[in-house]
Amino acid sequence: MDAGLNRCPLQEHFLPRKNSKENLDRFIPNRSAMNFDYAHFALTEERKGKDQSATVSSPSKEAYRKQLAETMNLNHTRILAFRNKPQAPVELLPSNHSASLHQQPKSVKPRRYIPQTSERTLDAPDIVDDFYLNLLDWGSANVLAIALDHTVYLWDASTGSTSELVTIDEEKGPVTSINWAPDGRHVAVGLNNSEVQLWDSASNRQLRTLKGGHQSRVGSLAWNNHILTTGGMDGLIINNDVRIRSPIVETYRGHTQEVCGLKWSGSGQQLASGGNDNVVHIWDRSVASSNSTTQWLHRLEEHTSAVKALAWCPFQANLLATGGGGGDRTIKFWNTHTGACLNSVDTGSQVCSLLWSKNERELLSSHGFTQNQLTLWKYPSMVKMAELTGHTSRVLYMAQSPDGCTVASAAGDETLRFWNVFGVPETAKKAAPKAVAEPFSHVNRIR
């Protein structure tokens, strides 16, 4: 589909018109701004000069006249004034303080420009429109993986090339989740038949299949070094050590319905899980045991709808953001050390996904009905910085580029869009001040 034909170019910014009181169409003087005494003097001075031509003014009198005119500001006074003079600025500080302020101006960080439209759009036909699945991920090698029905495609952001990784058999599919390993080479693929396949993207070779742990589809995946955590419709969360023959090392039981969100913290010590039972669990890796069912560290029950959107803060330890579904519509912030809810913000619509900026104190959320938008928030004030529109269906999936600048979003409208929303970090600007932006100005098909 040629989505690019519907894109609107950047609108030219027009300056606002001046106040209508100043847009005068006739040259009618403003009487309140006129000095009638000086006007009479100026108009009659030349005639008086002719009548008194015999009288020769001395140099001292001429100098006195000029000095008097300068003092009274007569040389700069118009006879016909069409508007009032602007009011003189009020001196709020003593002159010595004012001078010091002019000598040391305060530096103000310019506001970052945030494009309101997507920079690139790829066609994503047959993407499964299911809130509980996770079908998009961007690996550390700058390759984006997306599952379209039974097929997994890889899009190389560095070259713009597209390749097919695997097409799953009908009896096993469709693909229900996908997640890159930290090395950016190996990718896990969750299936509708409860299996998880591990693939080498460099050689397009299947390495192994994990099965027997779940009884139904695997809708969420999360890597923690060599541990692959899987979440199923059966409510189970399983830690798999992919290095060993019998991979299951821990099983977490706490959700009563499908596990639709999984995220490990940056330290790898805590796991957040969200489910269709409206519950968020925090699990501690240090107390996990393979001998018995592991108890959660915190059980968070404040949401009133399914919790799929989970995001650990990159700049503040133990800070977790969670988003609720259509019956909840809130973003909540948690201290996972104490289990306390720090803040709750009503977004007005279903929260499908959350991403923290790696470079700024900002949070991006994707939403469903009615606007199907991406909203950028300033943290911790939670003031809206921008709303990005373009999708015509709920924005179910988001993924962030390795450099943290670009976000990819996929929706039920069968489009994959790229947004330059988070900006370039200051370190990258200093290292490459003349970097050329990627040519995100046309539309390609992903297959």
UniProtKB/Swiss-Prot annotation:
Its keywords, alphabetically, are: Cell cycle, Cell division, Mitosis, Nucleus, Repeat, Ubl conjugation pathway, WD repeat
Q: Could you tell me which pathway this protein works in?
A: Protein modification; protein ubiquitination
Record-level GO BP terms:
cell division; protein ubiquitination
What are the start and end residues of each WD repeat? 128-165, 170-209, 213-250, 254-293, 302-344, 346-387, 390-429
Q: Does the keyword Nucleus apply?
A: yes
Record gene name: CDC20-2
Q: What happens when the gene is disrupted?
A: Delay in plant development due to reduced cell number and male sterility.
Q: What is this protein called?
A: Cell division cycle 20.2, cofactor of APC complex
Q: Briefly state the protein's biological role.
A: Component of the anaphase promoting complex/cyclosome (APC/C), a cell cycle-regulated E3 ubiquitin-protein ligase complex that controls progression through mitosis and the G1 phase of the cell cycle.
Compartments it resides in: Nucleus
Identify the species of origin.
Arabidopsis thaliana (Mouse-ear cress)
InterPro entries, alphabetized: Cdc20/Fizzy (IPR033010), WD40/YVTN_repeat-like_dom_sf (IPR015943), WD40_CDC20-Fz (IPR056150), WD40_repeat_CS (IPR019775), WD40_repeat_dom_sf (IPR036322), WD40_rpt (IPR001680)
